[in-house]
C-alpha cells in the first residue's frame, strides 16, 4: 500500500502511513460498553466482579502484546510532534524526532481514560480500570490520563499505577483546587474549560473572571488550556479569538 501510494504521490505530496490512534489508547472501557452496554457494565461491577476484572485484565494484556508486536515489526511512529495526543493535546517535546523504523514504545505518548467510570468509586476505579490499563500504558515513555471525566479523589490511584504519567486531564467538572494540589508539577495540568461559556453566548467580563480564577489556583502548575467540545460558536469566530486573548492575558 505504501509503495503504491508512493508511486502515485511521489513529487506531489509528502505522506506517512501510521497506525490508527485507537491502537495507542489503553482505556478498554469503551470497548466493554460496546460489548455489554453501559447499564449492564454498571451491574457487572456488582454482579460479576471477578469475571469482569478478568476480562479487563485480558484486554489489557492483549493490547500490550499488540503494542510489542508493532514495536518488533517497526510499525510505530514518533508522536512527539504536531500530532493529536491524549485527549486534546499536542505531542511536542524537546526530544529529537525519529524515523518510524527507529521508534520504540518508550519514545511515544500513550493514553487512557475512564469516562465511563465517572460515577464509579475511587476503589472500583482502581480495581477495574487503572490496575488493568497500566499494563499497556506503562509501556510508553510518556502517559496521558483522563478526558471529559472528573478525576477527583482518583489521583492517588493513578500515581500508584501509572509510572510514566506526564499529562493529566482536568475537565470542566473537576475540582480545580484538588487538581492543582494533586498534580502540582508532577505532570502537565491539561485544563479543559467549560465550552458552554462560548457555545451559549459570550460574556467577556465573565470569561475574564473565570480564566483568572483558574490561573490563580493553578499558578504553581504546568498549564495547558484546551478548549474542546465546541459544537457551535454562534456563526462567528470572534468569540474564539477573544477567548485566546483572554486566556493569554490570564495565564501570562
How does the language model describe each region?
Residues 1-252:
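Active-site loop segments of alpha/beta catalytic cores
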Amino acid at each position: 500500500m505504501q509503495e503504491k501510494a508512493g508511486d502515485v504521490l511521489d513529487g506531489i505530496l509528502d505522506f506517512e502511513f501510521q497506525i490508527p490512534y485507537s491502537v495507542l489508547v489503553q482505556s478498554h472501557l469503551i470497548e466493554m460498553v460496546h460489548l455489554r452496554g453501559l447499564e449492564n457494565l454498571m451491574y457487572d461491577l456488582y454482579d460479576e466482579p471477578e469475571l469482569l476484572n478478568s476480562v479487563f485484565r485480558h484486554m489489557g494484556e492483549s493490547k500490550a502484546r499488540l503494542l510489542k508486536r508493532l514495536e518488533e515489526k517497526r510499525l510505530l511512529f514518533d508522536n512527539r510532534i504536531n500530532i493529536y495526543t491524549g485527549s486534546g493535546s499536542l505531542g511536542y517535546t524537546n526530544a529529537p524526532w525519529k524515523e518510524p523504523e527507529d521508534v520504540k514504545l518508550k519514545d511515544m505518548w500513550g493514553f487512557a481514560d475512564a469516562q465511563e467510570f465517572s460515577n464509579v468509586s475511587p476503589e472500583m476505579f482502581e480495581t477495574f480500570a487503572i490496575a488493568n490499563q497500566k499494563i499497556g500504558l506503562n509501556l510508553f515513555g510518556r502517559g496521558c490520563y483522563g478526558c471529559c471525566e472528573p478525576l477527583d479523589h482518583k489521583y492517588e490511584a493513578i500515581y500508584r499505577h501509572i509510572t510514566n504519567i506526564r499529562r493529566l486531564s482536568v475537565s470542566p467538572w473537576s475540582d480545580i483546587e484538588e487538581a492543582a494540589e494533586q498534580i502540582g508539577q508532577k505532570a502537565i495540568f491539561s485544563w479543559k474549560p467549560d465550552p458552554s461559556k462560548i457555545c451559549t453566548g459570550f460574556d467577556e467580563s465573565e470569561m475574564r473572571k473565570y480564566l483568572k480564577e483558574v490561573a490563580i489556583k493553578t499558578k504553581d502548575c504546568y498549564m495547558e488550556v484546551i478548549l474542546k467540545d465546541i459544537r457551535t460558536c454562534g456563526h462567528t469566530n470572534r468569540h474564539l479569538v477573544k477567548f485566546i486573548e483572554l486566556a493569554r492575558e490570564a495565564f501570562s
